Amino acid sequence: GLGDVYKRQDINGIGYEVILKTLSDTRIAELCTPVIYGSSKIAAYHRKVLELPAVNLSIIAQAEDAGANRVNIINCVDDETKVELCQSTTAAGEAAYLALEAAVTDLKRGAVDVLVTAPINKHNIQNEQFHFPGHTEYLEQCFGGLGKKALMILMKDNLRVALVTGHIPLAQVASKITVEDIVSKLRIFNQSLRQDFGIVRPRIAVLALNPHAGDAGLLGKEEEEIIIPAIQEAEKKGVMSFGPYAADGFFGSQVYDKFDGVLAMYHDQGLAPFKTLAMDDGVNYTAGLSIVRTSPAHGTAYDIAGQNVASEESFRQALYAALDIYRNRIRYREATANPLRKQYFDKGGDNEKLDLTKEEDE
């Protein structure tokens, strides 16, 4: 089985619902050792109110105690926290932050391997330690290291959409798009496609900022002055990227099938078409960090909380994606650490005399 997976959520939204529905499938605990960071009491409340399938939760004090083939939970949230389904409350935000902080601490010391987060509410989680627009920015600070930037990738099957600008007002987008930033995002994207998705020579499509890709400068100069130079600059650094493509035609005629990744300039440009294609089972992956973190591509959904109608498909896919990426990273590390060994095994080992995998001094 694969190492521990950590999960946390907003207590008034659909977080516990999608987690419990996903983990009620006993096969999941055979793939990994799930550790929920939250409250067993609140989980039990959600299960009862929503009449969810029974999940036996094994309460543990620390991640190291997690038992295989069972669903573990670490109580890091005050049991007395009041659950008010469908409401955004400060208590819910506090609970979400405590769970996130506990899990991040365990990730940092290697007690858990991957992080799958259920949706948080961006408003109620804000406090003195957490003043970020969302998970991605918080995790970037925790795991980005020196100058390491996170990249948000929305994925479903072979469609992977990444963003140059994320959670900022639309009015600021044009001024925030620079050659340097596009090149940096292309390099992170390229590296992620190689190590996290096992693609040897990734092909990345770059979307234009303006309608009709700027129409030769009639509808804006960003393509000629910023995006095209960025594509050329990235090529010198070993990134195969193409474009800029006008976004409407690009998605309309399914050109995206020909690429391993799509780099959009701003949030809605990339996410509107993505969610049209993958609303129920899309996954949000935070690339560029030292740890693996995924989440469902949907929000807290207060409007349907407590009705047992939320689909857990996106959360299940987020869990599978985290496990796949974790395994791919291990394979990538092994392949790049010792390329000879990989070649040797790939070609089969019937000639025992010539063993390239032996160290000189063995």
Where are these predicted regions, by residue range?
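Glycine-rich phosphate-binding loop
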Residues: 1
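Contiguous, glycine/small-aliphatic-enriched amphipathic segments in soluble metabolic enzymes
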Residues: 4-135, 176, 180-265, 269-275, ...
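Short, flexible loop segments at boundaries between secondary-structure elements
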Residues: 142-159, 289-303
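Glycine/threonine-rich beta-strand-loop-alpha-helix active-site module
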Residues: 126-151
